[in-house]
Amino acid sequence: LNLLNDLEPVVEKELNRHISIAKEWFPHDYIPWDEARNFAHLGGQDWTPQEQRFSEAARTSLIINLLTEDNLPSYHHEIATIFGREGAWGEWVGRWTAEEGRHGTAIRDYLVVTRAVDPVALEQARMFHMQEGFQAIHPGMLAGLSYVSFQELATRVSHRNTGVATGDPIGESLLQRIALDENLHMIFYRNLLDAALELQPDATMVAILSSVRDFAMPGHGIEGFQR
């Protein structure tokens, strides 16, 4: 609790910096809507395997990235529990959640509109994965702060690489836009972690060591993740 209070001025400063440089964007701008067709329920045609796009590796990465983003309610619960909903911490929790919410919306629209993957299997996977939820490996404020610092960086890299793997300029543009969000989130958490090192160096280093030693992406439990 003391560290949360001690970091509050840093959170406020970093939140103001973040808001000043974050660029507003809209998921619908990145979706090729002219490629969309109705499915059978509305008189069109249901998806067939012949319609799938991209390499197997790119499709798997897109699905895993989306399912990972879909678990946002669990992530929100985790960070709201750790950081609280009051003051600058609470403002950041709300801002972070709102920005992250765009990612799943945009990726799902892209995959469904382009018919790149089976939308029925995708929805079934979403239902299963969200019911499983997410729980932090190491509890506690410092452990959580350390974990998200590394996780946001890894997520940025994952989205960027997946965009390149699609070979589709539209898909790459979308995932690059999402990666920019993740990069700003990483910088926010990294700067807080730097401040924590100044205030509680020993405890923070222990948390960093644990995060690096036991690191796993939020979506590590998804079927096919290891591929």
List where the protein language model places each region.
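Non-heme di-metal
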Residues: L1-R227
